[in-house]
């Protein structure tokens, strides 16, 4: 019967390349010794109530044989090895779909070599559907479908609805062939076929041992390929593995290679590393800081006028007076202040009051340059250069010599990022000096501490910039 089932198989060439083949060969050597007539596991026929169970042996027989013949001292190790072999389907319990080994009187049976995984079986879902359909045709308690098999059969019947008649006919033909076999032979072959499918379509929760590890497959295809880091250092971790095959000796590193290695390790020592606890604390602090600005978590203040009857938001926008919550956000960092148009305006006013606004004006001019059309970029680069960096510039900024020299070279070939280094230097200066003074200034503190006062703004007449929609909504109020 086993030979009559046409399950899909791969070619011999692919079989030899499979990373699992080494494991299969070792297991099959042990199985061959187990089946030896003189020194193997004794196989017997057990008499049960009104029936016989042919060609079986117990789980304790396997464990004892492994301990005796493979010089294994620990019974737990022998049980683990036997479980791995059972999971690959070389022997199986006759009354359980879970392929595991138990050190007791549970009966097991050897799998026929035709169904061994070394034959590289790749059975299709249609084959599985034929097998399950055939099981339903045989009115025997031992062939009843398990719950997960019944679910699989229903799913396959839906998937192959158009060709189900052909599947049913194939199952019916196989069932007729099975009926012509001897009773004992049929019982053995039925259990072996069931074990085959327990390997390739395992019980939910069990591991499919036929899957190929992509890392092992890659190593098998490139056995002599060495891994190198991006810095040119050879990764010799595999050389310490007990299963690694030594590669031919390589040339000793040259002086330049040693210098590169020293430089690489020095860079690694200087790298800034953070503990996961510090990263988690930083993330929690950021979340707590910005939680009140997330409308999904905290109701916005003022509320959305399109969702409520409160027009405070429109009134604040019309008055151009920033809310207390908005001003508070400027203190989180200089990026928050520069990102807000009102924040930029207040920051610029503060710097103008101290006669030091040239840094911020330069930074804003460079940001504007990045958004200009390409045809306007060369002329705008010259304007920025003449205003902030040229000798005798009216709003000269203070740059270090390195940034100034690089910017001078970049101006010869003007582009949107000509002043990138100068802008970064000015940004750091403002962040360390101008921005802290702005946050500590009385102007910012007054905006921050100002209490929101109730406003009695007359609804009529509407200002001339009021949209018709807004005018209509205020009339309704």
Swiss-Prot record:
SMART domains in UniProt: DEP, G_gamma, GGL, RGS
Keywords: Cell membrane, Cytoplasm, GTPase activation, Lipoprotein, Membrane, Palmitate, Phosphoprotein, Signal transduction inhibitor, Ubl conjugation
Keyword Amino-acid biosynthesis: no
Record domain DEP: where: 37-112
Modified how: Palmitoylated. Ubiquitinated, leading to rapid proteasomal degradation.
Boundaries of every RGS domain copy: 333-448
Location of Phosphothreonine modifications: 243
Principal cellular location given in the protein's record: cytoplasm
GO terms, molecular function: G-protein alpha-subunit binding; G-protein beta-subunit binding; GTPase activator activity
Residues covered by region (Disordered): 236-257
InterPro entries (alphabetical): DEP_dom, G-protein_gamma-like_dom, GGL_sf, RGS, RGS6/7/9/11, RGS6/7/9/11_DHEX_sf, RGS_DHEX, RGS_sf
Residue numbers carrying Phosphoserine: 229, 241, 434
Tissue specificity of this protein: Brain-specific. Predominantly cerebellar granule cells.
Domain G protein gamma: 255-316
A Gene Ontology BP annotation from the UniProt entry: positive regulation of potassium ion transmembrane transport
GO CC annotation: cell tip; cytoplasm; cytosol; dendrite; dendrite terminus; glutamatergic synapse; neuron projection; nuclear envelope
Subunit record text: Interacts with GNB5, forming the RGS7-GNB5 complex. Interacts with GPR158; promotes the GTPase activator activity of the RGS7-GNB5 complex in absence of glycine, in contrast GTPase activator activity of the RGS7-GNB5 complex is inhibited in presence of glycine. Interacts with GPR179. Interacts with PKD1; this prevents rapid proteasomal degradation. Interacts with RGS7BP, leading to regulate the subcellular location of the heterodimer formed with GNB5. Interacts (phosphorylated form) with 14-3-3 protein YWHAQ. Interacts with SNAPIN. Interacts with GNAI1. Interacts with GNAO1, GNAI3 and GNAZ.
The protein's role, per its UniProt record: GTPase activator component of the RGS7-GNB5 complex that regulates G protein-coupled receptor signaling cascades. The RGS7-GNB5 complex acts as an inhibitor signal transduction by promoting the GTPase activity of G protein alpha subunits, such as GNAO1, thereby driving them into their inactive GDP-bound form. May play a role in synaptic vesicle exocytosis. Glycine-dependent regulation of the RGS7-GNB5 complex by GPR158 affects mood and cognition via its ability to regulate neuronal excitability in L2/L3 pyramidal neurons of the prefrontal cortex.
Name this polypeptide is given: Regulator of G-protein signaling 7
Top-level taxonomy: Eukaryota, Metazoa, Chordata, Craniata, Vertebrata
